[in-house]
Amino acid sequence: MRNVELIFIPTPTVGHLVPFLEFARRLIEQDDRIRITILLMKLQGQSHLDTYVKSIASSQPFVRFIDVPELEEKPTLGSTQSVEAYVYDVIERNIPLVRNIVMDILTSLALDGVKVKGLVVDFFCLPMIDVAKDISLPFYVFLTTNSGFLAMMQYLADRHSRDTSVFVRNSEEMLSIPGFVNPVPANVLPSALFVEDGYDAYVKLAILFTKANGILVNSSFDIEPYSVNHFLQEQNYPSVYAVGPIFDLKAQPHPEQDLTRRDELMKWLDDQPEASVVFLCFGSMARLRGSLVKEIAHGLELCQYRFLWSLRKEEVTKDDLPEGFLDRVDGRGMICGWSPQVEILAHKAVGGFVSHCGWNSIVESLWFGVPIVTWPMYAEQQLNAFLMVKELKLAVELKLDYRVHSDEIVNANEIETAIRYVMDTDNNVVRKRVMDISQMIQRATKNGGSSFAAIEKFIYDVIGIKP
C-alpha cells in the first residue's frame, strides 16, 4: 500500500523535467510505498513542454502532474540582464499559486491516509522553501547538475559574506574552491555571475541551499570522488546524496523531432564502422554564428572523419556552409536538425562527441563510454568543461571559457586537432578513462552500488523506514 507522497517542483524546461521524471521513477522502483506529484509552472518560450508531458504521462502510472495556473502578471525576459534573474523572478511570483496547490494536496491526501513527506525542488525553485516553511514540510533540493557546481555555490555564499562585488569578466583571478583539486579560473564561472542581477539571483540561491534538509546531486562518487567526499565530510552543510547519473535511457522523442529523419540517421549509423563517427551537438539554446558554422565545416573537412552534425534550420542558412561542402562530404557526413541524442550516443558507430557540455549531455556520454570534446556555450557549461578536462581528465579540451555571445572565433585547425585527438582509438588516455568510468557508473546505479545506496539513504531519511 502506498502511503507516502513527495511533491516535486522542477524548473519548467525539458532539460530539467527529464531528470526529475527519471529520479521519480528510480525512487518508486526502489520503494513502492512512494508516489510523486509534479507541479508544472509556465515559462516563456517553453510551449512544447505540454506536448512532452502528455507523451510521457501514460508511462509513469505512479506520477501525477498538476499544472500551476499561469501568472496574471508575467515578467518579460528582456527586462533583465540575465536569464537566471528572469527565471528567479518567475519562480518567486509562482509561490502563492504553488502554496495553494500544496495545501489542497495535503488536505485531499490526508483523507486517504497518505502523508506528504516533503517538497523536492529544482535549483531555480529554491525560493519555494517559503512554501515548505509555511506548512512545516521538509525541503529537499534535486540538483540536476554535478557536485562541483554545488561546491561553487557553497563557495559563492561564503565569498558574498566577505565580498559582495560581481565577478569581473576576462579577469585572470584564480579561485580556491573547497571541493575542487585545482584552482578554478573565474573565467569559467556561470555567465550570470558577471552581471548584477544574475549575481544577485545566484547569491540568493546559494544561501537558500544552506537551509535545505538535504541536497541530491545528479552525479556519483565514481565521477566526482573528491567533491562528493568533500560534502560527506562537511559538518555545517545539508546532507548531500550523490544519486546519479540520472537520465532517461529510453529518451522520449522531442516534440519537434522528425521521426522519419530519425530512422534515416539511425540507418546511416548502422552502416558505419565501430567508433568511426564524431557527433556534434550544441544543445537546444545555442545559436551558432555563420562564421562559426563555416569553421566547423572546414574543421570536419580537414579531419576527414565521418560525422553527424546536429544543426537546426534556424541556426544556419545555405550561405553559412562553405560552397560545395555538402557535395564533398556526401556519404561521409550527415547534417540533421533535432537529433535523438541518447540513441546516437548509445550507437556503436559513435566514437566521439563535440558538446556544449550541458550536464545531461555529459552524463549520457559517460554512461555510453563516448569521450567528449568541450565547447561550452552558456549557463554553467564553462564550469562543467573545466571540471571534465582539468579536474576529472574525462574530456578533450577545445574550449573551456567560450561563451555563445562572444566575438571569439574558434578556427578550423583547432576543431580538427581536437576531433583527431578524441577519435584516436590508440593510446588515447581520455578514451580509456571514459570507458572505465562508464562501467563504474553503470554498476553504481545497481543494487549494492554507491548511487543506489545514496537513494536508499535518502528514502530512509525521508520516510524513517528502510526500503
From Swiss-Prot:
EC number in record: 2.4.1.-, 2.4.1.91
Binding positions for UDP-alpha-D-glucose per the UniProt entry: 144, 341, 356, 359-361, 364, 380-381
Endoplasmic reticulum found in the keyword field: no
Binding-site residues for an anthocyanidin, renumbered to this chain: 16, 379
PROSITE patterns given in the database record: UDPGT
Catalyzed reactions: a flavonol + UDP-alpha-D-glucose = a flavonol 3-O-beta-D-glucoside + UDP + H(+)
Role summary: Possesses quercetin 3-O-glucosyltransferase activity in vitro.
Family: Belongs to the UDP-glycosyltransferase family.
Name this protein carries in UniProt: UDP-glycosyltransferase 71D1
Taxonomic source organism: Arabidopsis thaliana (Mouse-ear cress)
